[in-house]
């Protein structure tokens, strides 16, 4: 789709097809913004804009679960760590927080907790500031700081140990003897230090930082710790990571006090609440005082105080159920459209983009905005040369809310004529039934789509080939050094024996740069199965669903063989995939269609012969219910459906939604219904709630 005006979106009235279009669009936008924010330290939009984008995605996915894997940002945390830093695997995942934007969201947060825990009162909640900085994890072993890392993608972060040590107030030893003790917090720069730092940058002729958060992130992620040491970095800690002493604190309130006693910097402006009224009152007071604070905050955080309740509540794949961030509202800006261009995505979607006179809204410079589709341009009568209003609050991207008609120059404003053919290959554009996005169907020959697919293949979430950015990919394609993905891995050999114009002789490349690129390409030949599957850019297969497929097929050979059988209408494989929660019908259909195209099969065959694709390794395979598919049906007396599902997942089980031949166990509550009958017919093991609880306790 080319447009996403959420002021006209009523989620309750969305059809599945329309919802799919929106989620398709969100995947592209979120991926672009993640790259800019986490990896480049150069955000294209504000946190508020991004939050609403992701929030809309999550709400649609909640209503249409089968769309969860059209884009996997409902499952995503952070961004892939930079290849410039060594990697650190988090012993305990660093999840992001779910976001709330109104009182109703916070009220729903409390209600969900009550339903999950089966209680009728609000548990005690700690209310804290949400510091706008860079998240970090610091590990102490027997009281000595041994490792520090950024959040990264939540599972793997960047090693910033030496850089963190340059923050003078950060303890490098603790008066404890625990084998492992990890603290988590936020690195930031005060507003005053930020202004001074930018003055220094300007005097040195260096680029200015757009806001304190980016200054902090850029400073702690320096390759040279000596540079970091010159920056006025500060920090707050507010949580634990992996610990061997699980009795260090029993509540969040106690934890903050004990961390302060250990001489960590802890923001002391927190309260303990047990009702919605005081929680909102805290938010309102903080919002009033926000501009008087020495540092940037972008909201408040509510956390269930009792750690035992936190453990019961658990987490989704991206965020804990026991916490939520109540974000501050966003702002409005006005600027001029200088041009409207078209971009072609890897699936052929043709999207108009408005180029703007750069405008700074809440510290973030915005220079373009997606117009989504032809209908938006026409309905809002948007023209090149118009002054437009950018609205952030409640919108999913830097959205053009409307045209300032009073400022329109009728002599110079220019209507944008949406083309009927692809701007890349001149193929006729089509709008599929139920969609508003115009698409180019020439996927195998359209250079724009080939370019986007190659960019996706080498991206950090896929094969992560550092040094092969978009400009270089475009250069290689334009000059026929490569034609397709496979050619990337032939680049070094062809450069030696085939190309008359060697890459190292081209301006802007150089021998060191080229050799480093070849080294990175060779390193990328060793890839794990789920990243290989994701890199293929199969429609509806995001990072999360790629992991599910890798877990199912285990090896590249089996993935290909089973997918080819699927393409030949193997019903058993199709049924198995559609019944995997998180895969489903849409992904199974697209996997089948992908392998029905001979060019795709040829591509994969060549890649398999070039790459070393590691078999799937699941860290939870040693859990007691690993590889078991369990289905729950009916209502349960002692625990909620959500909690009983979490119990199973913590033990390594895969929770299914339908009973099939792949089901290992059915757990029945009251009013079990048709699933019980089907399980009996298939001879599947059946236990009741009491038996389940007994089994879990014994495990």
Curated annotation (Swiss-Prot):
CDD domains: BRCT_DNA_ligase_like (cd17748), LIGANc (cd00114). The active site is at residue 130. InterPro entries: BRCT_dom (IPR001357), BRCT_dom_sf (IPR036420), DisA/LigA_HHH (IPR041663), DNA_ligase (IPR001679), DNA_ligase_AS (IPR018239), DNA_ligase_CS (IPR033136), DNAligase_adenylation (IPR013839), DNAligase_N (IPR013840). The keyword DNA damage applies. It catalyses: NAD(+) + (deoxyribonucleotide)n-3'-hydroxyl + 5'-phospho-(deoxyribonucleotide)m = (deoxyribonucleotide)n+m + AMP + beta-nicotinamide D-nucleotide. One of its GO terms (biological process) is DNA repair. DNA ligase that catalyzes the formation of phosphodiester linkages between 5'-phosphoryl and 3'-hydroxyl groups in double-stranded DNA using NAD as a coenzyme and as the energy source for the reaction. It is essential for DNA replication and repair of damaged DNA. Belongs to the NAD-dependent DNA ligase family. LigA subfamily. NCBIfam families: dnlj (TIGR00575), PRK07956.1 (NF005932). This is DNA ligase. It comes from Orientia tsutsugamushi (strain Ikeda) (Rickettsia tsutsugamushi). The lineage of its organism: Bacteria, Pseudomonadati, Pseudomonadota, Alphaproteobacteria, Rickettsiales.
């Amino acid at each position: 789709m080319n447009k996403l005006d959420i002021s006209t979106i009523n989620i309750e009235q969305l059809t599945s097809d329309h919802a799919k279009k929106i989620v398709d669009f969100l995947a592209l936008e979120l991926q672009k913004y993640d790259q800019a924010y986490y990896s480049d330290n150069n955000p294209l939009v504000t946190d508020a804009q991004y939050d609403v984008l992701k929030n809309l995605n999550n709400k649609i996915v909640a209503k249409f679960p089968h769309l969860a894997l059209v884009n996997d940002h409902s499952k995503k945390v952070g961004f892939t760590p930079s290849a410039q830093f060594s990697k650190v695997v988090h012993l305990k995942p660093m999840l992001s927080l779910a976001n709330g934007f109104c009182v109703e969201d916070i009220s729903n947060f409390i209600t969900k907790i009550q339903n999950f825990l089966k209680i009728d009162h609000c548990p005690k909640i700690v209310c804290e500031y949400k510091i706008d900085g860079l998240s970090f994890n610091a590990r102490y072993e027997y009281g000595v700081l041994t490792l520090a890392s950024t959040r990264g993608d939540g599972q793997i972060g960047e090693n910033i140990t030496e850089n963190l040590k340059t923050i003078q107030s950060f303890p490098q030893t603790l008066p404890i003897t625990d084998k492992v003790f990890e603290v988590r917090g936020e690195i930031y720069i005060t507003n005053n230090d930020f202004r001074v730092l930018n003055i220094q940058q300007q005097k040195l002729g260096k680029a200015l930082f757009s806001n304190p958060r980016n200054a902090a992130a850029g400073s702690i992620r320096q390759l040279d710790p000596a540079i970091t040491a010159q920056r006025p970095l500060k920090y707050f800690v507010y949580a634990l990571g992996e610990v061997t002493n699980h009795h260090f604190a029993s509540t969040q309130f106690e934890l903050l006090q004990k961390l302060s006693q250990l001489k960590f910097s802890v923001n002391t402006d927190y309260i303990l609440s047990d009702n919605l009224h005081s929680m909102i009152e805290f938010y309102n007071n903080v919002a009033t005082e926000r501009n008087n604070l020495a540092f940037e905050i972008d909201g408040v955080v509510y956390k269930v105080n009792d750690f035992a309740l936190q453990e019961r509540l658990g987490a989704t794949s991206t965020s804990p159920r026991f916490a939520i961030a109540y974000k501050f509202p966003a702002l409005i800006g006005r600027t001029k459209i200088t041009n409207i261009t078209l971009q072609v995505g890897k699936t052929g979607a043709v999207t108009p983009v408005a180029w703007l006179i750069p405008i700074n809204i809440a510290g973030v410079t915005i220079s373009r905005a997606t117009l989504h589709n032809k209908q938006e341009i026409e309905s809002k009568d948007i023209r090149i040369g118009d002054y437009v209003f950018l609205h952030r609050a409640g919108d999913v991207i830097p959205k053009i809310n409307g045209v300032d008609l009073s400022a329109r120059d009728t002599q110079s404003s220019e209507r944008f004529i949406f083309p009927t053919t692809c701007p890349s290959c001149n193929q006729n554009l089509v709008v599929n039934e139920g969609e508003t996005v115009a698409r180019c169907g020439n996927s195998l020959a359209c250079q724009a789509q080939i370019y986007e697919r190659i960019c996706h293949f080498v991206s950090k979430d896929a094969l992560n080939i550092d040094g092969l950015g978009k400009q270089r990919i475009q250069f290689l394609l334009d000059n026929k050094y490569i034609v397709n993905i496979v050619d990337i891995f032939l680049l070094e050999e062809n450069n030696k024996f085939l190309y008359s114009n060697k890459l190292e002789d081209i301006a802007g490349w150089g021998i060191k740069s080229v050799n480093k690129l070849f080294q990175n390409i060779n390193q990328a030949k060793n890839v794990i199965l789920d990243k290989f599957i994701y890199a293929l850019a199969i429609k509806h297969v995001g990072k999360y669903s790629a992991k599910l497929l890798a877990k199912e097929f285990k090896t590249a050979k089996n993935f290909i063989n089973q997918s080819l059988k699927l393409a030949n209408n193997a019903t058993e494989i199709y049924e198995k995939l559609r019944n995997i929660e998180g895969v489903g019908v849409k992904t199974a259909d697209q996997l089948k269609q992908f392998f029905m195209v001979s060019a795709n099969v040829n591509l994969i065959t060549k890649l398999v012969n070039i790459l070393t694709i590691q078999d799937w390794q699941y860290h939870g395979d040693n859990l007691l219910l690993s590889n078991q598919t369990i289905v729950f049906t009916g209502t349960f007396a002692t625990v909620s459906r959500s909690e009983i599902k979490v119990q199973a997942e913590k033990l390594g089980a895969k929770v299914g939604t339908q009973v099939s031949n792949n089901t290992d166990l059915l757990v029945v509550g009251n009013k079990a219904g048709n699933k019980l009958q089907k399980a009996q017919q298939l001879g599947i093991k059946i236990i009741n709630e009491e038996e389940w609880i007994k089994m879990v306790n014994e495990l």
